[in-house]
Amino acid sequence: MVPSRYLYLVRHGEADDDDALTGAGRLQASAAGERLRYTRFSAIRHSPMQRAEETADLIADFLPGVPVGASGLLGDYLPPVSGPPDLPPPYAGLLGSYTPEERSEGAELASAAIQRYARPGGQDDSELIVTHNFLIGWFVRHALDAPDWRWMGLNQCNGGITVILYRTGMPASLVSYNDIGHLPPALRWTGFPAEIVPPPR
């Protein structure tokens, strides 16, 4: 039997301008914790950013005994982009807002994050990561063998849950993507580009 390693990726809750969770963000984090409370995790890892740490701590309240720790590999940075020269203007504008040094550092961190976390394990395992929109898109892009720039446009809602399965000798499987079914309607779609939010029924 091939061991199954599940990587759960949660985007932090909604945050204010000071990087602290808003009231809605705290509710989103708690709802994610409630949703995940029956999953047996080996560890919870999170970005060093305050909004991710607060989210991880609130989720951990539902997962007693699971070790929690920060990793600089899971921070809020720009993953690599070496795509076509004719990127859509919004994407090109995003790249222009980062210095060459920031882009180089982000590429190194993103590569290291994949090597550390996006891999099969020697036994059945589930690990939870609380991180940011860009990096979750980067993990999904990697799982699907898409071009490295294609994390752009893969957006996550605050409190959304994405799950990727890794097994030795097999391609990664995207089990679920941006699951927000655990969030009440008023807490869904925050942090998501307004122009692509599905219209209400």
Question: How should these model regions be labeled?
Answer:
Residues 13, 133, 180:
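Active-site metal-binding loops of divalent metal-dependent hydrolases
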Residues 1-4, 65, 69, 76-88, ...:
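Acidic, low-complexity terminal tails and accessory targeting/binding regions
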Residues 2-71, 97-103:
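Active-site-proximal alpha-helix that buttresses catalytic centers in soluble enzyme cores
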